Amino acid sequence: MEVSYKFGFDAAHHFDNYPEGHIYRGVHGHSFQVEVALAGEPDPKTGFVADLGEVERACRDVRESLDHRMLNEIDGLALPSLENLSLWIWRALKPRFANLARITVRRDSQGQSCTYTGR
């Protein structure tokens, strides 16, 4: 069984590894959507796979670290691709949730997404 929580944030980034004049090289921003999924069987005492209030609080911390920031300036996001952003969020949340199953980061306006499952 899987439960999930979604949140969004807006941030800017650039990719210095692209040639001069390439659209990705310049600073630009996106609205990102994140889905955090936890898997397991419901706890017989609570009926929950995870306390979604606790998940929401943890995601609020992640959101505050990313929202309206230059992603390149955040430790571990020098190359802020969807892939690296998914991994960064995983690493931020995994210590708090042993049953973390997947992180999906989307840029819906671009039709793009990346899902990381710990492998």
Predicted regions and their residues:
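Charge-rich, low-complexity N-terminal segments
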Residues: M1-R119
